[in-house]
């Protein structure tokens, strides 16, 4: 496969770099551990913008380290498949796994949204019934905030963070440690980067893809952390489409991953048919 320098000279490398950056940015927007944990942590400790940037960069560094290990491991393993006859089959297998990952991400997001909506409907009914009883018995209402959609695991992490750190002073080392540990959680997008690196069989281009993915992830995580520090609620109030964009990000991410899988599958199939 052509090295990155040759691809750059031919003008063909532009497709890989923006796609990897977009994958990283969309992964950071998905409802999950990194974004939810960081926002909850910054809000709980009443963190500054500087602390939010530190937290986002620390999470990105650890996440990048995991992706580098996976990607380089994949490229080392791929050296065993140097025969041209094996490459189309490897492309086809990678395409199947990538498309399967995209479908899994789409289904997981759809199921999480559906469960969240069902729980909110049940909560609305119980809350309305409870308020009706309080109006007759006590003459007052209990008010609860309706939270934004997030998966159950992420919500549990956020609640635990609030209990542990609410109102406490934390050091910069604690912030860095929290960010480093929070970024170690693997993600489907990292698997996609791994499979792309295996398919490309190019060390330089594979490393560039990982760096590009990390840049996109860093942009999102740092932005989320800073947004939490300056109160993301204000942004949501001024722009009604903010929450909708965040909730729809996993769908865009799964679509992009699926397109990459289709692209690889078509090339693999054409290679087998030759």
UniProtKB/Swiss-Prot annotation:
Transmembrane segments: 13-33, 57-77, 87-107, 175-195, 210-230, 252-272
Predominant location: membrane
Induction comment from the UniProt entry of this chain: By nickel and cobalt. Transcriptionally repressed by RcnR.
Membrane topology annotation: Multi-pass membrane protein
Keywords: Cell inner membrane, Cell membrane, Cobalt, Cobalt transport, Ion transport, Membrane, Nickel, Nickel transport, Transmembrane, Transmembrane helix, Transport
GO BP term, pick one: cobalt ion transport
Residue span of region Disordered: 130-149
Residues in compartment: Periplasmic: 1-12, 78-86, 196-209, 273-274
Compartment(s) of residence: Cell inner membrane
InterPro entries, alphabetized: Ni/Co_transpt_high_affinity, NiCoT_RcnA
Parts of the chain on the Cytoplasmic side: 34-56, 108-174, 231-251
Function recorded in the entry: Efflux system for nickel and cobalt.
Family: Belongs to the NiCoT transporter (TC 2.A.52) family. RcnA subfamily.
Protein's recorded name: Nickel/cobalt efflux system RcnA
Lineage: Bacteria, Pseudomonadati, Pseudomonadota, Gammaproteobacteria, Enterobacterales
């Amino acid at each position: 496969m052509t090295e990155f320098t040759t691809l750059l000279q031919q003008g063909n490398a532009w497709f890989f770099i923006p796609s990897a950056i977009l994958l990283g940015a969309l992964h950071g927007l998905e409802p999950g551990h990194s974004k939810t944990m960081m926002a909850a942590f910054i809000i709980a400790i009443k963190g500054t913008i500087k602390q939010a940037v530190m937290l986002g960069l620390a999470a990105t560094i650890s996440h990048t380290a995991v992706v580098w290990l996976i990607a380089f491991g994949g490229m080392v393993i791929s050296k065993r498949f140097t025969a041209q006859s094996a490459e189309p089959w490897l492309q086809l297998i990678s395409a199947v796994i990538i498309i399967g990952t995209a479908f899994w991400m789409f289904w997981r997001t759809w199921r999480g949204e559906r469960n969240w909506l069902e729980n909110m409907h049940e909560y609305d009914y119980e809350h309305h019934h409870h308020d009706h009883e309080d109006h007759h018995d006590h003459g007052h209402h209990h008010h609860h905030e309706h939270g934004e959609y997030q998966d159950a695991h992420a919500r549990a992490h956020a609640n635990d963070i609030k209990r542990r750190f609410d109102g406490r002073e934390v050091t910069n080392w604690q912030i860095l440690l929290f960010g480093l540990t929070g970024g170690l959680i693997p993600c489907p997008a990292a698997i996609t980067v791994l499979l792309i690196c295996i398919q490309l069989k190019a060390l330089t281009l594979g490393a560039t893809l990982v760096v590009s993915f990390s840049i996109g992830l860093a942009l999102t995580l740092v932005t989320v952390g800073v947004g939490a520090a300056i109160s993301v609620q204000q942004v949501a109030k001024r722009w009604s489409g903010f929450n909708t964009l965040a909730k729809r990000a996993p769908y865009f991410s799964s679509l992009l991953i699926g397109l990459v899988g289709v692209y690889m599958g078509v090339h693999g199939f054409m290679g087998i048919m030759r």
